[in-house]
Regions:
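Extended, charge-enriched "interface" segments that sit outside catalytic cores
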Residues: 63-162
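Short, hydrophobic/amphipathic alpha-helical packing segments
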Residues: 2, 53-56, 133
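Conserved NTP-handling cores and scaffolds of large molecular machines
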Residues: 5, 56, 60-63, 67
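Conserved phosphate/anionic-ligand binding catalytic regions in large, soluble enzymes, centered on
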Residues: 16-36, 152-162
């Protein structure tokens, strides 16, 4: 888009928002019950969490640099860690794994593990990654910020976790 229109797309722009009506055909189809709709929604959330987990796994490996803004150190609340971006990605990885386990429990109709520290809203994934992005840009690492991390931020806006 940037090559065509010359201006970069704002980072939080969402020119396309994808969604699905799977499990929502409840206008007379007797096979689409509340349970079917609920199961489809849970399965979709789990799939989204798995896809974002794949992104975070790559970012854990890629974001090993130490230079970051003071604001980012405050955000992660750790002034001693040597690889602050990696530390944040590890936290997100843990939250995504807990989210997947929780959703598995809901799908299998058993009491899920604790719902503590799971990702429910898109902003729970967007905000930490955007803080990471801003810090990288401010520390003259725009090339890194505008690669996989920017792709992930755009996917959050386009697809989300829910």
């Amino acid at each position: 888009m940037q090559e065509t229109f010359s201006d970069p797309l704002p980072i939080d722009a969402c020119p396309i928002r994808l969604s699905s009506w799977m499990g929502g055909d409840r206008d007379g189809n007797p096979n689409v019950t509340h349970e079917v709709t609920s199961a489809v929604l849970l399965d979709s959330r789990k799939r989204a969490a798995k896809l974002f987990l794949e992104d975070i796994e790559v970012l854990v490996k890629e974001l090993s640099m130490a230079d970051c803004t003071d604001e980012f150190r405050e955000y992660i609340n750790d002034f001693e860690v040597q690889e602050p971006y990696r530390e944040l990605m590890k936290r997100l990885r843990s939250q995504l794994k807990k989210t997947i386990i929780y959703l598995d429990g809901k799908i299998e109709k058993r009491l899920p593990e604790s719902s503590d520290d799971i990702l429910i809203h898109n902003d729970q994934l967007w905000e930490p990654l955007y803080a990471c992005y801003k810090s990288l840009v401010e520390c003259n690492m725009s090339i890194i910020a505008n690669d996989r991390l920017l792709d992930t931020l755009r996917r959050i806006k386009c697809f989300g976790l829910t």
